Curated annotation (Swiss-Prot):
SUPFAM superfamilies: Creatinase/aminopeptidase
Lineage: Bacteria, Bacillati, Bacillota, Bacilli, Bacillales
A biological process from GO: proteolysis
Name of the protein: Methionine aminopeptidase 1
Annotated catalysed reactions: Release of N-terminal amino acids, preferentially methionine, from peptides and arylamides
Gene3D superfamilies named in the record: Creatinase/methionine aminopeptidase superfamily
The organism of origin for this protein: Bacillus subtilis (strain 168)
Cytoplasm in keyword set: yes
Length: 248
């Protein structure tokens, strides 16, 4: 069931989203060669708690980190640990913050030091695909128009959209209905209504679209070992369009 949020709930979620955005800004200062993914996790946890929220992901289905940290060929759900970032890496950081019972959720992929032109293009296309999808986020539109816009743009740029992992509703639960694929035909699915809160999060591979989960039962990687990127915003559908909740 899709739960439309009240103005009061949206106010809380806007603040939760702002905390997520501020946490991204804080981590961005520290993303450089020589730092470990565990150190980034610790910085994020301290910062989120300082804002009066709690990390959404810590303990979620047994997840050990406060954030998901995925490097290079790792797509999503990377567990923070001893891995040290190197010049030329790309790192996807997925952050959730829970405030007064409601979640904010946003992911960004960052360059570490100097990255290749190919990796720059991967990041640019993935981020732009998010905004191509958001252009379709209007009341009365079908949900799959978002999906179709993302897939069309990504594939026209000669990249691949991951199909096993999808966007989702957000609220008192981190993952609510509806599920939002980032591929598919237009004009399908429920019509968007004011008060819906959605996490749109295209995951894009430089090579084939296929992924697998490692033995830790969390970290998802590309099958071909090529790099991948992930960009996500939590948005609210309004009377006239959408409002990005996960920004300052």
């Amino acid at each position: 069931m899709i739960i439309c949020k009240t103005p009061r709930e949206l106010g809380i979620m806007r603040e939760a989203g702002r905390i997520v955005a501020l946490t991204h800004e804080e981590l961005k200062k520290h993303i450089k060669p020589g730092i470990s993914t565990k150190e980034l996790d610790q910085i994020a946890e301290r910062f989120i708690k300082k804002q009066g929220a709690i990390p959404s992901f810590k303990g979620y289905n047994g997840f050990r980190g406060s954030i998901c940290v995925s490097v290079n060929e790792e797509l999503v759900h990377g567990i923070p640990g001893s891995r040290v970032l190197k010049d030329g890496d790309i790192i996807s950081i997925d952050i959730g913050a829970k405030l007064n019972g409601y979640h904010g959720d946003s992911a960004w992929t960052y360059p570490v030091g100097n990255i290749s032109d190919d990796d720059k293009k991967l990041l640019e296309v993935t981020e732009e695909s998010l905004y191509k999808g958001l252009q379709e986020a209007k009341p009365g539109e079908r949900l799959s128009n978002i999906s179709h816009a993302i897939q069309t743009y990504v594939e026209n740029e000669q990249f691949s959209v991951v199909r096993e992992y999808v966007g989702h509703g957000v609220g008192q639960d981190l993952h609510e209905d509806p599920q939002i694929p980032h591929y598919g035909p237009p004009n399908k699915g429920p019509r968007l209504k004011p008060g819906m809160v959605l996490a749109i999060e295209p995951m894009v591979n430089a090579g084939s679209r296929y992924v697998k989960t490692l033995a830790d039962n969390w970290t998802v990687v590309t099958v071909d070992g090529k790099k991948c990127a992930h960009f996500e915003h939590t948005i609210a559908i309004t009377e006239t369009g959408f409002d990005i909740l996960t920004r300052v």
